[in-house]
UniProtKB/Swiss-Prot annotation:
Residues 54-613 are extracellular. It is a single-pass type I membrane protein. SMART domains: CA. It comes from the Eukaryota. This is Cadherin-11. Residues 54-159, 160-268, 269-383, 384-486, 487-608 form the Cadherin domain.
């Protein structure tokens, strides 16, 4: 209310000032003539100067926001040629002429008819001209002048933002800059103090202050603590007129938040923590949690935990949960209640980030004692070893002891233990175990060549607490004994040329032994003693587990003997050694001069494929029998085909209706044999025509002939079908091409019983009733009218 009264008084003063200014302006804002020399010759050759009148303008001023009842006098235009007789007319044009500014064309007085606002427009440019009232002839050249709107203090200061937000670290020194606020005033800064602003603080003292000229807000108190108060609300005022009475003002709100610094150390809320853990807990299991409180936030409140002392440093560890800022105590090793029942730890909590400016507030850490009690647990039996490996010879007698496992009860009760084999790991039941002492024995003989390692699992359970069990893996290795004789590494079959030279090598053989390498190689190759001096072939042991077979003589002949069987004895290096006699089949073949095979006994190739002569004959016989069956089946099927021309009692080989409207020939009038449709096998894409002679004549169909050895049954059948389909001599030797026009329309229209019944015709179709069921539909269509009437 006080500000409104002051504003009202100021406006009254400005109005009085304006009135006096208007009178002065009327006196001063006159047009004065200015003489410009113009040369003109006079009498006696004198040069006379003729006066040319011109305009010399001063700026006009008009005060803004005038609200009086009468138009404001801006100024007066006057020319010295105006004698006051009313012959001169003043004309005003330009910005706002006739709308805002009007002129009295006789006196030249200019008035403002509307209230002006300098903040909308500060000046107007107008043009004045004096003309003859009667002729409108210009008496003076037009000239421009400016009307300036004079400012008054009618706009309060305005801040750029209605609300400001700023941050400043807690415990900042006095005078620390927080934020700068800025206000603006729409009034003319070049005229008076209307736009001269002064800042002051209305709310927020004594914590903050503001610089009057710049608007910079600074801290005013030291050691402001965020933990005590985090947010402050400050109100800043900007006042024009240099802050003097009568000036206008505006305000803004500033929210200032104290940001955190690490000025507080972590503190444990208690001096001792009590925890307990079962001895059955596994390493890595959580035992408990501790937490030190730090009022700081963010990274300034981060705390790291560590164990710095205690008798449980080797048994426990502590990690930091950064989400909850807790220290998590975890088990590091397996506990034993019977060995140690309690532990003590000294845990330290320290800040991760320390601000050097506040190091004097330290130390930024705290310690606490953690006492952990171990609880007794009913533990399962424990094997003395984590795994067992035993050996047993293959082919050992049933009941042979393989080895012994042993487990004990770790509890003080020391309960009795019983053992068993996990049968899922011994499905064939090769082993058994003594339930009382843990001795593992064989049940049946083992074969290393079948299974070299047996991996089983053994359970140990307490007699009185069978839910407590332990499991241990047992690996049993079957030790090899030399129980397999060596044999040929492959099914060898050798070929020797008829022209082979003496001592010529023609094959190299090797051996294989299922036994272990200790009982296998080195292999020894030899001929049996009874044929050590074989006249045809010799054997050479290469001493690298291979042997070469050589020709001892020349002159082999297939006509005399084309097959030789050479027994070879192979011995291994085991103790005792094992040996076997293997027979090598040698074929005599014809070869060229280079030793390449040209021809050989067919049986050799058959045997090379693993087939004997008898087997080959049986296979060929089966193939021939199958071919004969297929050929007979095809022949019988063709003979049993329904004839294309059916001679039955009910078959009618005459015309029912003669369709000769289009001048058709014999093919159009001959009846169609229904048997053709009944036998679709006789119809294919190739349809012979009666009116077209075949381009070539088919030979008489040959009879069945024996198929060649390489016959393809599928090709044979397809060939026969093709011949039957394309044979023009086979019935029907007729064309059914006319039936391909079905559906293309007919001039005869559709057949119906109604139309036929009403047709005037001499034909009698009653005989159709005697043709049997096959022609019943036709008889119904062409029945007599009386019959039709009776039926209807």
């Amino acid at each position: 209310m006080k500000e409104d009264n002051c504003l009202h008084a100021a406006l009254i003063c400005l109005g009085m000032l304006y009135y006096s200014h208007a009178i002065t302006t009327e006196k001063l804002n006159h047009v004065r003539p200015s003489l410009h020399g113009h040369h003109e010759k006079g009498k006696e050759g004198q040069v006379l100067h003729r006066s040319k009148r011109g305009w010399v303008w001063n700026q006009f001023f008009v005060i803004e926001e005038y609200t009086g009842p009468d138009p404001v006098l801006v100024g007066r235009l006057h020319s010295d040629i105006d004698s006051g007789d009313g012959n001169i007319k003043y004309i005003l044009s330009g910005e706002g002429a006739g709308i805002i500014f009007v002129i009295d064309d006789k006196s030249g007085n200019i008035h403002a008819t509307k209230t002006l606002d300098r903040e909308e427009r500060a000046q107007y440019t107008l043009t004045a001209q004096a003309v003859d009232r009667n002729t409108n002839r210009p008496l003076e050249p037009p000239s421009e002048f400016i009307v300036k709107v004079q400012d008054i203090n009618d706009n309060p200061p305005e801040f750029l933002h209605e609300n400001y937000h700023a941050n400043v670290p807690e415990r900042s020194n006095v005078g620390t800059s927080v934020i700068q606020v800025t206000a603006s005033d729409a009034d003319d800064p070049t005229y008076g103090n209307s736009a001269k602003l002064v800042y002051s603080i209305l709310e927020g003292q004594p914590y903050f202050s503001v610089e009057a000229q710049t608007g910079i807000i600074r801290t005013a108190l030291p050691n402001m603590d965020r933990e005590a108060k985090e947010e402050y609300h400050v109100v800043i005022q900007a006042k024009d007129m240099g802050g003097h009475m009568g000036g206008l003002s505006g305000t803004t709100k500033v929210t200032i938040t104290l940001t955190d610094v690490n000025d507080n150390p972590p503190k444990f809320p208690q001096s001792v923590y009590q925890m307990s853990v079962s001895e059955a807990a596994v390493p890595g299991e959580e035992v408990g949690r501790v937490k030190a409180k730090d009022p700081d936030i963010g990274e300034n409140g981060l705390v790291a935990y560590s164990i710095i002392d205690g008798d449980g440093m080797d048994m426990f560890e502590i990690t930091t949960d950064y989400e909850t800022q807790e220290g998590v105590v975890k088990l590091k090793k397996v506990l034993d209640f019977e060995t140690k029942k309690s532990y003590s730890l000294k845990v330290e909590a320290a800040n991760v980030h320390i601000d050097p400016k506040f190091i004097s507030n330290g130390p930024f850490k705290d310690t606490v004692t953690v006492k952990i009690t171990v609880e007794d647990a009913d533990e399962p039996p424990v094997f003395l070893k984590p795994s067992y490996i035993f050996e047993v010879q293959e082919n050992a007698a049933s009941g042979t002891v393989v080895g012994k496992v042993h487990a004990k009860d770790p509890d003080a009760a020391n309960s009795a233990i019983r053992y068993s084999i996990d049968r899922h790991t011994d499905l064939e039941r090769y082993f058994t175990i003594n339930a009382d002492d843990g001795n593992i024995k064989t049940i049946k003989a083992l074969d290393r060549e079948e299974i070299a390692w047996h991996n089983i699992s053994v359970f140990a359970v307490e007699v009185h607490k069978q839910h407590q069990e332990a499991k241990v893996p047992v690996a049993i290795k079957v030790v090899d004994v030399n129980d397999n004789a060596p044999k040929f590494a492959a099914a060898y079959e050798a070929f020797v040329c008829e022209n082979a030279r003496s001592n010529q090598q023609f094959i190299t053989i090797s051996a294989d032994d299922k036994d272990d390498s200790a009982n296998g190689p080195r292999f020894i190759f030899s001929l049996p003693p009874e044929i050590i001096h074989n006249p045809n072939f010799s054997l050479r042991d290469n001493r690298d587990n291979t042997a070469s077979v050589l020709v001892r003589r020349e002159g082999f002949s297939r006509q005399k003997q084309d097959l030789y069987l050479l027994p070879i004895v192979i011995s291994d290096g085991g103790l005792p050694p094992m040996s076997s006699t293997n027979t090598l089949t040698i074929r005599v073949c014809g070869c060229d001069s280079n030793g390449s095979l040209l021809s050989c006994n067919a049986e050799a190739y058959i045997l090379n494929a693993g087939l004997s002569t008898g087997a080959l004959i049986a296979i060929l016989a089966c193939i021939v029998i199958l071919l004969v069956i297929v050929v007979l089946f095809v022949t019988l099927k063709r003979q049993k085909k329904e004839p294309l021309i059916v001679f039955e009692e009910e078959d009618v080989r005459e015309n029912i209706i003669t369709y000769d409207d289009e001048g058709g020939g014999e093919e159009d009038t001959e009846a169609f044999d229904i048997a053709t449709l009944q036998n679709p096998d006789g119809i294919n894409g190739f349809i012979p025509r009666k009116d077209i002679k075949p381009e070539y004549q088919y030979m008489p169909r040959p009879g069945l002939r024996p198929a060649p050895n390489s016959v393809d049954v599928d090709d044979f059948i397809n060939t026969r079908i093709q011949e039957a389909d394309n044979d023009p001599t086979a019935p029907p030797y007729d064309s059914i091409q006319i039936y391909g026009y079905e559906g293309r329309g007919s001039v005869a229209g559709s057949l119906s019983s109604l139309e036929s019944a009403t047709t005037d015709s001499d034909l009698d179709y009653d005989y159709l009733q005697n043709w049997g069921p096959r022609f019943k539909k036709l008889a119904d269509l062409y029945g007599s009218k009386d019959t039709f009437d009776d039926d209807s």
